[in-house]
């Protein structure tokens, strides 16, 4: 598959990017701060990708994580990364469909799902969130990390460019619409943080990947003509829309 055909996160991963979330480490750290995790916690990570977040959770809290994805390459990378850290007893990597989770009701203390809900239409978002609600224990927390409109939806032209840039039917919402999504699915409380997207900004790249990592990504992004066209197209679009698009991190609490 050429650089121009890959999904946005797959293309960035091929350049060496390890933080594939719109708010990078800033948003993920905020989610961690809201998690109330302990070594006894049972965690489900949906769309685990290469298991970067799952590994950090276990290293920090000593919890047990079930890391699921549908992409075979992502699962292979996740298993390799978990094995490299010697964390196979703490992280269980498996293929599973987020719409029909293979877990009983009230199974997890925390469900974490970063940069996935944005990729679905609003009705599909609600179906996924309802499934996360089902498997959470009473008092459990859903931690999500997505893209939001800062004021109103993009114009048709800009929305079309966004879909073209990331090669996915991206469907962000406003801050209030994200809140209402979780409340309407039964959550009792929704805490939120939003900020500048770090995915393609120079400052965000350095913060998320380190200086050497950022240099490597930019070098790989400019190295071939296909990569260069795709990389610059993504960079220019997100830069032009930096005031209209933010990351949003939400901690939604299930009632006891």
Describe the function of each predicted region.
Residues 170-186:
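Short alpha-helix
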Residues 15, 147-169:
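Short, glycine-/aromatic-enriched active-site segment of Class I SAM-dependent methyltransferases
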Residues 126-141:
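A short glycine-rich, Lys/Arg-flanked "PGG" loop and its adjoining helix->strand segment in the class I
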Residues 191-256:
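Conserved Class I S-adenosyl-L-methionine
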Residues 9-23:
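Class I SAM-dependent methyltransferase Rossmann-like catalytic core
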Residues 21-39:
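Conserved alpha-helix/loop element of class I SAM-dependent methyltransferases that forms part
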Residues 99-111:
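A short acidic, Gly/Pro-enriched loop at the edge of an enzyme's catalytic core
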């Amino acid at each position: 598959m050429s650089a121009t055909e890959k999904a946005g996160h797959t293309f960035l991963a091929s350049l060496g990017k390890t933080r594939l979330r719109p708010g990078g480490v800033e948003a993920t750290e905020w989610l961690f701060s809201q998690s109330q995790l302990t070594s006894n916690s049972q965690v489900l990570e949906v769309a685990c990708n290469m298991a970067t977040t799952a590994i950090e959770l276990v290293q920090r809290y000593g919890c047990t994580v079930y890391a699921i994805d549908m992409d075979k390459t992502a699962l292979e990378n996740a298993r390799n990364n978990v094995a490299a850290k010697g964390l196979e007893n703490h992280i269980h990597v498996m293929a599973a469909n987020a719409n029909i989770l293979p877990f009983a009701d009230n199974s997890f203390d925390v469900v974490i799902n970063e940069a996935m809900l944005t990729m679905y239409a609003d009705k599909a978002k609600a179906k996924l969130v309802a499934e996360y609600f089902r498997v959470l224990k009473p008092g459990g927390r859903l931690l999500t990390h997505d893209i939001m409109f800062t004021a109103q939806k993009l114009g048709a032209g800009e929305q079309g460019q966004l879909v073209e840039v990331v090669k996915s039917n991206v469907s962000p919402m406003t801050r209030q619409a994200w809140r209402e999504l979780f409340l309407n699915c039964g959550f009792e409380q929704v805490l939120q943080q939003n900020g500048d997207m770090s995915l393609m900004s120079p400052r965000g790249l350095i913060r998320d990947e380190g200086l050497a990592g950022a240099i490597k990504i930019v070098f790989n992004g400019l190295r071939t003509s296909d990569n260069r066209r795709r990389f610059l197209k993504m960079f220019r679009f997100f830069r032009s829309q930096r005031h209209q698009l933010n990351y949003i991190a939400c901690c939604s609490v299930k009632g006891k």
